[in-house]
Amino acid sequence: MVEIGPKSVSSRDGHALAETSPYYARRLELIPDRLDRVRYAIADRDFASLGATIEEEAIDLHLIAMSSRPAIHYWSPGSVEVLRAVRELRQEGLAAWSTMDAGANVHVICEPDAEADLVDRLESLPSVGFVIRDDVSDGPERLAEHLI
C-alpha cells in the first residue's frame, strides 16, 4: 500500500468523467480483444500473456482518467515507484506484472514461487507502507454474517 484513505476522486465520479476523454471510444473498441486475450491466457495457463494484458489494461484505464476533463490523477510518486520496480523485477527474470484500479495502490501478480522475492523487494521501497498478500480462493462462500 502506498496510500491509505479515500481517493481524491471517487470511482463513481471517475466513471462519469471517462466519456470526456478523447481516448474513451478507442478503449471500448479494444476491450473485446483484451477479454479474448485474457480468456486464452487463462485457458492456456500462459501467465506472461495474462500479466502483460492486465498491465496494458490498467495503464489504459489511467490514461482515460488522466485525459478526462477535468483530468484525474490517481497515481502518486509511490505508484510510479512500484510500477518501475515491477518492470525492473521482470527484466531481472522474476515473472511479475502490475495492475491498478482507480486509486494510487498497485496490485502485483506473480506465481507462488516468486511471491517471497517479490514481497521482499516491494517492502524495501521507501513509498510502500505495507504489502497485502492475497491468494486464489477456493470459490464463493455464503456467509451468515456480513464481513464488516
Where are these predicted regions, by residue range?
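C-terminal nucleotide
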Residues: 1-148
